C-alpha cells in the first residue's frame, strides 16, 4: 500500500521534471535547436497546424535552422508564421528551403531568459512539493484508518522526503545547466 503511494509520488515528480525539460528547450539560448519552433503554428488548409507537421526542421549549423516544407505552396505561410511568433526570428527563403538564423543574444535578453528559466524551475519545485503534500495526506489517512502503524507512517514520510529531495535536486541541476547554456557567448 505504502509502496504504491511512493511509486505514484515518484512517477508524478518525474513527469514534473520531464515537463521542466520540455519548457527549458523552448527557451532560446542563441544556439539552433528544432524545439525552439515547437510553439509555432501554420495555417494549413484553414486549420492551425504545428510547424513540425508541415515541414522538416533540421539544424544546418550551430546558429541556423533549416526548414524544408513538404509542399512548395506552404513556404510563404511558414515564413509568415515564424515572423509572427514572438521568438524574434527572421527567416530567409531560398527557393523551397527556409533558413532561420538565430540572432546573438544580448546581455539583457540573456538575463530575461535566465529569469524565465528560474521561474519555470520554481514552478516545478512547487509542483513537486504539492505532490509530496498530497502523498503525505494519503499516508496520514492510512494511519488514521489504522491500516498502518506509526512506525510505518514515519518511515513513509522519510522515504517520501528523500524522493522529494532527489527530484528538487534534479530541478536545480537542470536550472544550473540552462543558466550555463544561456551565459555562453
UniProtKB/Swiss-Prot annotation:
GO biological process, one term: cytoplasmic translational termination
Ranges in coiled-coil conformation: none
Keyword Magnesium annotated: no
Subcellular location: Cytoplasm
SUPFAM superfamilies: Ribosome recycling factor, RRF
Gene Ontology molecular functions: ribosomal large subunit binding
Keywords: Cytoplasm, Protein biosynthesis
Gene Ontology cellular component list: cytosol
Annotated function: Responsible for the release of ribosomes from messenger RNA at the termination of protein biosynthesis. May increase the efficiency of translation by recycling ribosomes from one round of translation to another.
Family designation: Belongs to the RRF family.
Entry protein name: Ribosome-recycling factor
Gene designation: frr
